[in-house]
């Protein structure tokens, strides 16, 4: 694409030796589709927004983690108090003898799975390392770059230790109710979600959990689940031959007419229009 926005190294790194730095987004505003001359890790702390990565939409909120390669196209829209940090790095500048490919999905041809989640424990540990990394990356002493790279190595190992698939919180996890709830919602794309049954199983207050969820994400539980389902529907409309009625079932809508109403309200176009427009842009 001739007019593709490309973020340049010289606008983010202080010199050609610096391998890693941190870009805060407090908050992250709407940002047009772009690629980079560098790679990045995206860590979402709170709020919500629509993250479109290589034309696939993700409704993001606290705990979402993305591994972005230089060539990946992504954008942010529909943001609501979205707070995140980008840890940006140049693979060719890294000097530490670390098996980066084993730590970072997609690193220089490694198998790429871009979207993961961190629970509260992993987020707390990652935040501590990122704060130190940000301090060093802004430093001017002779060892600042080396210290920043050491901390980057610690960060990617911390993320690998604590990350989990969006719908698969480990059974042995000691994560919070909020982490368990978001995982349960990710597992409810095709079927109804019963919050009362979840709260009974976890022995918690439904009212308190609703309040906590809204405080951390900026959405109600139902709003979040609806947005996640619509994102999944957008992806299926673009990348699968399924009929719209089949897609509505796979996204938790038993009535395809109701699905069309909700989809149109959320995206501004009907499912058929979305599919047609997406096929035209391919």
Swiss-Prot record:
GO biological process: positive regulation of DNA-templated transcription; rhamnose metabolic process
DNA-binding region as annotated in the record: 196-217, 244-267
A GO CC annotation given for this chain: cytoplasm
Subunit structure: Binds DNA as a dimer.
Function per UniProt: Activates expression of the rhaSR operon in response to L-rhamnose.
Site (Interaction with sigma-70): 246
Annotated GO MF terms: DNA-binding transcription factor activity; sequence-specific DNA binding
PANTHER family: ARAC-FAMILY TRANSCRIPTIONAL REGULATOR (PTHR43280), HTH-TYPE TRANSCRIPTIONAL ACTIVATOR RHAR (PTHR43280:SF13)
Source organism: Salmonella schwarzengrund (strain CVM19633)
HTH araC/xylS-type domain location: 179-277
Protein name stated in the entry: HTH-type transcriptional activator RhaR
Entry keyword set: Activator, Cytoplasm, DNA-binding, Repeat, Rhamnose metabolism, Transcription, Transcription regulation
Compartment(s): Cytoplasm
Main subcellular location of this protein, as a coarse class: cytoplasm
